[in-house]
Amino acid sequence: MPAAATPVLETRDLTIRFGGHVAVDAVSCAFHAGTLTAIVGPNGAGKTTYFNLISGQLTATSGAVLLGGDDITALGAAGRTRRGIGRAFQITNLFPNLPVIENVRLAIQARARGAGSLLSRWSSHRDWIAEAERYLAEVNLSAVRDTLAAALPHGDKRKLEVAIMMALEPDVFMFDEPTAGMSVDEVPVILDLIHKLKAAGDKTILLVEHKMDVVRSLADRIIVLHNGQLVADGEPAAVIASPVVQEAYLGQAPKGDATREASHG
């Protein structure tokens, strides 16, 4: 039997304490290329904290984060971005006073400079702009390339954040409630972008999302956190039907109703 492929991303006994409170409690998970894993749980379950530990916004009390089999626990957020972890936040993280095209160009420039010996392939500022325009076309933002990021509607800011992540060429895409604050018309657009990333087949995608209809439409795996602990992990239908999940996560929903939106946090 061939050996199992090395996970793209892995957490081993990942733990963080704030005083006497254990916010994430020895969570071990492996994530492979070509998969989309939704991380769900009730308000305060530790979902965003777990994301912050993976992307380097928080430092673990104990445990490890591995990327491609390499221990990256000691790296901060910038170092993990350079190594291949891309993150979109609940609140968009853009350069608001720069044009849309410049937001993407800066990501490409940062990636090129981080590539060291590959820097020579970039001959001019014009090359970065040309590539930025291609990413903007992929997220349908070409028409607003010269608009200040601050002036974009919320849905377009989300799309710009996806373009920036794509420009960084990460191995791991992390989306923290990507549909938060979006209108009914905007939600399908961002979901379509995530679908396209998944369909490419070579990226590892993690998603924190409180809308169960969104989770069911995107995820091929769900993990459930409750009080900082991993309480369920598996295919969506099985996880959603689990009595443990019904009690821990969907307890406020009518019995048998697994599609209701749950509290987020």
For each feature predicted by the language model, list its residue ranges.
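Glycine-rich phosphate-binding loops of nucleotide-dependent enzymes
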Residues: P2-G265
